[in-house]
């Protein structure tokens, strides 16, 4: 006799984004040899980055453990949403509203926290500079942060977007998996033809690559979805995407910004 095995929405909401992170990163690792679509060459990646890939993996795993613990606590405190799911009929419009609300909340939280970590010299030196050891970003380095930064920016930001939007644990499975894919894509270091994220969002791998360069650290703080706060508050750095002579692409800021 076969025994049923039920997996709760809360468990999936905790585990799915972590699994999605490594699966989607793995796709970009497989594509990283495509020099004609890279924003930096492999040589630049090896020479400019200030941290080993093994250290990056360890750092990401630490953050994901913290992320999982906070998610479990959050679901425990808010309680099971099973009864609410039965009582409430979710329409597409309700789900769309929750997604958009969560996206705006997450973007707002991350913009101001991210910008403050650049402006506060102590926080930048001791915490945020760890992420900027990756001058040439790559996919699975997206969540390579100091544990304190991971908690403040990503984990607490995610919890706020969950609570403010009013989404259920089941909806959160899809939202946080989507947010994870978007974050990985922004750090992938590739500009691939037909990438839907590049078509829909101005905040993309080229946009975020600018921020990782020395001349861009005061600009392009927005992540992971929109660029509205950069535009509103004057931290938007315009750029053009140019073909490199040795193959691939380069995100080049306008001259007046690069000389700033």
From Swiss-Prot:
Cofactor: Fe cation
Chain positions of motif Histidine box-2: 128-132
GO cellular component labels: endoplasmic reticulum; endoplasmic reticulum membrane; Golgi apparatus
Any one Gene Ontology BP term: sphingoid biosynthetic process
Motif Histidine box-3 location, chain numbering: 207-213
InterPro entries: Fatty_acid_hydroxylase (IPR006694), Sterol_Desaturase_Related (IPR050307)
Major subcellular site: endoplasmic reticulum
Chain segments annotated as transmembrane: 11-31, 55-75, 92-112
Catalytic class of the enzyme: oxidoreductase
Places the protein is found: Endoplasmic reticulum membrane
UniProt keyword annotations, A-Z: Endoplasmic reticulum, Lipid biosynthesis, Lipid metabolism, Membrane, Oxidoreductase, Transmembrane, Transmembrane helix
Summary of the knockout phenotype: No visible phenotype; due to the redundancy with SBH2. Sbh1 and sbh2 double mutants are severely dwarfed, do not progress from vegetative to reproductive growth and have enhanced expression of programmed cell death associated-genes.
A Pfam family matched in the record: FA_hydroxylase
Family: Belongs to the sterol desaturase family.
Protein name as catalogued: Sphinganine C4-monooxygenase 1
Species of the source: Arabidopsis thaliana
Gene: SBH1
């Amino acid at each position: 006799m076969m025994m049923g095995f039920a997996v709760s929405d809360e468990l999936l909401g905790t585990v799915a984004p972590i699994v999605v992170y490594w699966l989607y990163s793995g796709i970009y690792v497989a594509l990283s040899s495509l020099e004609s679509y890279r924003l930096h060459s492999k040589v630049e990646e090896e020479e400019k980055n200030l941290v080993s890939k093994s250290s990056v993996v360890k750092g990401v795993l630490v953050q994901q453990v913290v992320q999982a613990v906070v998610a479990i606590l959050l679901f425990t405190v808010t309680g099971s949403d099973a009864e609410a799911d039965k009582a409430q009929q979710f329409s597409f419009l309700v789900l769309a509203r929750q997604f958009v609300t969560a996206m705006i909340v997450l973007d707002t939280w991350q913009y101001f926290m991210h910008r403050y970590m650049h402006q506060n010299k102590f926080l930048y030196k001791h915490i945020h500079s760890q992420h900027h050891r990756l001058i040439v970003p790559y996919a699975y380095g997206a969540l390579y942060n100091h544990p304190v930064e991971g908690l403040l920016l990503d984990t607490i930001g995610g919890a706020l977007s969950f609570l403010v939007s009013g989404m259920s644990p089941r909806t959160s499975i899809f939202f946080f998996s989507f947010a994870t894919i978007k974050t990985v894509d922004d750090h992938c270091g590739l500009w691939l033809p037909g990438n839907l994220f590049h078509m829909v969002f101005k905040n993309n791998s080229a946009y975020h690559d600018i921020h990782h360069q020395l001349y861009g650290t005061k600009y392009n703080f927005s992540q992971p979805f929109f660029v509205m706060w950069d535009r509103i508050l004057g931290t938007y750095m315009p750029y053009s995407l140019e073909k490199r002579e040795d193959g691939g692409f380069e995100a080049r800021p306008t001259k007046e910004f690069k000389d700033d």
